[in-house]
Amino acid sequence: MKTFTAKPETVKRDWFVVDAAGQTLGRLATEIASRLRGKHKPEYTPHVDTGDYIVVINAEQVRVTGAKTSDKMYYSHSGFPGGIKSINFEKLIAKAPERVIETAVKGMLPKNPLGRDMYRKLKVYKGANHPHTAQQPQELKI
């Protein structure tokens, strides 16, 4: 019996909607990253994108444990000397709540072209509304 390898053109991708309200950031991000990779499917193949589309709503209501609200820092650099910028979780969740979940999930995906394709299947919205109702996403409990 030969080893099964999924073909990119035969992969069936479903759409799921995840409510982030009251969820812990890390636990939510690990489950989302796993589903974006397709590890929950029996036909998972490491070198083929077998994952599903994930729509995350209520991103501004995600929570972190302990003192991470004020202590967790997000860094970015302009590329110029002295161009490092930092912002803590509390300010970032007020400014751009989508980026908190996107950053957490992106760090859990492969750092290569396949990982970038997986990341493009993640859609994050700060409110309860999203423009993907035409895809009829299924509710996913995490």
From Swiss-Prot:
Keywords: Ribonucleoprotein, Ribosomal protein
Entry annotated with the keyword Lipid metabolism: no
Quaternary structure, from the entry: Part of the 50S ribosomal subunit.
Family statement: Belongs to the universal ribosomal protein uL13 family.
Protein name as annotated: Large ribosomal subunit protein uL13
Gene Ontology terms: cellular component: cytosolic large ribosomal subunit
Any single GO BP term: translation
SUPFAM superfamilies given in the database record: Ribosomal protein L13 (SSF52161)
Organism: Stutzerimonas stutzeri (strain A1501) (Pseudomonas stutzeri)
Protein function: This protein is one of the early assembly proteins of the 50S ribosomal subunit, although it is not seen to bind rRNA by itself. It is important during the early stages of 50S assembly.
A GO MF label: structural constituent of ribosome
CDD domains found in the cross-reference section: Ribosomal_L13
Pfam families named among the record's database cross-references: Ribosomal_L13
Primary gene name: rplM
